[in-house]
């Protein structure tokens, strides 16, 4: 009897959490796309323009690293940009989500973690409708194999895990340190430059390379490029590497968030 | 049947002076060896309280005496540092209406959003939309973004959503009537319905005559301590006497 009551309670909590997530995500998306007729596809504009810019500037110089094909450079730059854009959008929106809803948290009892999570979920939705189809078509044209298209899920899943972990971490830190956005901007820039997005990883000096491997996005970009561009079947080792980095970061972020959240209310 | 029980509830919170906190300053103070643990203050001191079903309780006391904090503890927004809180039944908080609104999205979307935030399911809220719009007299504004409403209309909407249900426990923090005169009457009627409908009500108010008239029991908080608890009239008298002494 007691057990069934407990089960019932947790089920109710799960349902409430789900409902909250649902309304918050639809709120986020509605606010973002109200009155813009391109809607979700605005989010594609940024990586497309950036890819064009990089190709115009670096394309000819770096083409030799990409089998003397500018097209390969374009695709490599685009996949990298998609990942880094998703990362920076997710985490910087998650950063302010807890503090931004502070007055609400002071008035209604709500699970705090739903706010950073709703930001990530809104971006996942946007990615799934906007960028993902384009990547899938690219992959299919390159590899002529459905297995590669399906395997795209894994690096993307790893990316979502990394973003959720970092999102939890920064949203919690922001409660304590209100000047965090300035520092975080710098961090994003470092991650952005240290991931081989618009330059080939081969030009990085040997002494510096080990540091670049610390970048949590590197294994994800590598795995995504292998699946999308190489034309060979998905490399499982790369996929596992990406997922592992995702799980580690999510665990880290969630642990910090969980340990600190009892102190949030005094500062909101 | 008791619906709320507080046993020896104490709450320590970080003090207001600590509200300037940033990474730069914290790092500097660590390097200079001046870092100290944030100071904490006792906001509620060993509160014991049992509320039975259907009781109407007025909470009075000076500003900063912990009245709203006590309500937050009961609503589960704050966790007590020591002691235990037990609550049976659904709590409807009626604190500063409109806090959950998003000005960018339409009235109808806000009804769903606010309702779910307050703890109802989306399906439930969808059925209530009509009655809420009707009560708030905003049928013509269904698809207008909330930023297009006047502040009085927003308050009306907040009140209509928060009171469209019959909660087991109603918590009122200084908001009893909003909007123009005709709407105030509607509000009062609805609040009176709650009063009659055997709901448990907790009110924080500085309107002492209101507490005397509408509440059965009174609680007087002073600097986080429960100074007096008893009949509403006695509590108000006690409170006034202490004020006159000063």
Describe each region flagged by the PLM.
Chain B
Residues 2-43, 233-246:
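Pre-NBD coupling/linker segments of ABC/ABC-like ATPases
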Residues 25-32, 112, 124-141:
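Conserved ABC ATPase "signature" region
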Residues 60-62:
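The feature captures the beta-strand-to-loop junction immediately N-terminal to the Walker
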Residues 184-197:
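Helical segment within the ABC ATPase nucleotide-binding domain
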Residues 205-206:
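H-loop/switch region of ABC-family ATPase nucleotide-binding domains
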Residues 214-231, 239:
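H-loop (His-switch) and adjacent beta-strand-loop-beta switch element
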């Amino acid at each position: 009897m007691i057990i069934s009551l407990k089960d019932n309670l947790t089920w109710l909590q799960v349902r409430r959490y789900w409902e909250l997530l649902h309304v918050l995500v639809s709120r986020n998306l509605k606010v973002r796309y109200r009155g813009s007729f391109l809607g979700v596809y605005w989010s594609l504009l940024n990586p497309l323009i950036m890819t064009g810019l990089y190709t115009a500037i670096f394309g000819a110089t770096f083409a030799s690293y990409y089998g003397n094909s500018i097209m390969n450079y374009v695709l490599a730059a685009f996949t990298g940009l998609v990942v880094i854009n998703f990362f920076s959008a997710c985490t910087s929106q998650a950063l302010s989500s807890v503090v931004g809803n502070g007055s609400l948290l002071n008035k209604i009892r709500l699970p705090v973690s739903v706010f950073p999570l709703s930001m990530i979920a809104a971006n996942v939705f946007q990615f799934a409708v906007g960028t993902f189809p384009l990547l899938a078509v690219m992959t299919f044209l390159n590899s002529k194999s459905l297995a590669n298209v399906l395997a795209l899920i894994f690096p993307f899943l790893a990316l979502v895990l990394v973003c959720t972990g970092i999102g939890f971490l920064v949203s919690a830190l922001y409660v304590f340190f209100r000047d965090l956005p300035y520092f975080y901007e710098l961090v994003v820039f470092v991650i952005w430059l240290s991931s081989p997005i618009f330059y080939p990883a081969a030009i990085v000096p040997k002494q510096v390379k080990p540091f670049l491997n610390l970048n949590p996005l590197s294994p994800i970009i590598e795995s995504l490029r292998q699946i999308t561009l190489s034309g060979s079947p998905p490399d499982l080792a790369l996929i596992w590497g990406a997922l592992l980095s995702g799980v580690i970061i999510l665990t880290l972020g969630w642990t910090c968030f969980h340990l600190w959240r009892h102190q949030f209310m005094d500062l909101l | 049947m008791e619906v709320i029980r507080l046993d020896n509830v104490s709450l320590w919170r970080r003090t207001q002076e600590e509200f300037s906190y940033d990474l730069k300053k914290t790092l500097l103070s660590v390097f200079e060896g001046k870092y100290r643990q944030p100071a904490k203050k006792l906001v509620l001191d060993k509160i014991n309280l049992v509320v039975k079903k259907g009781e109407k309780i007025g909470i009075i006391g000076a500003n900063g005496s912990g009245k709203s904090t006590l309500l937050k503890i009961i609503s589960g927004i704050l966790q007590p540092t020591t002691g235990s809180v037990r609550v049976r039944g659904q709590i409807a908080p009626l604190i500063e209406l409109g806090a959950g609104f998003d000005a960018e999205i339409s009235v109808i979307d806000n009804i769903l959003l606010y309702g779910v935030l307050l703890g109802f399911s989306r399906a439930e809220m969808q059925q209530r939309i009509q009655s809420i719009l009707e009560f708030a007299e905003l049928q013509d504004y269904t698809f207008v973004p909330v930023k297009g409403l006047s502040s009085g209309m927003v308050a009306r909407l907040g009140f209509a959503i928060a009171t469209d249900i019959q909660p087991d426990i109603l918590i009122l923090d200084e908001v009893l009537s909003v909007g123009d005169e005709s709407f105030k009457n509607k509000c009062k009627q609805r609040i009176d319905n709650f009063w009659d409908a055997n709901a448990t009500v907790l009110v924080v108010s500085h309107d002492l005559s209101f507490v005397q008239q509408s509440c059965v029991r009174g609680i007087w908080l002073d600097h986080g301590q429960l100074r007096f608890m008893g009949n509403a009239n006695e509590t108000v008298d006690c409170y006034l006497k202490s004020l006159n002494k000063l």
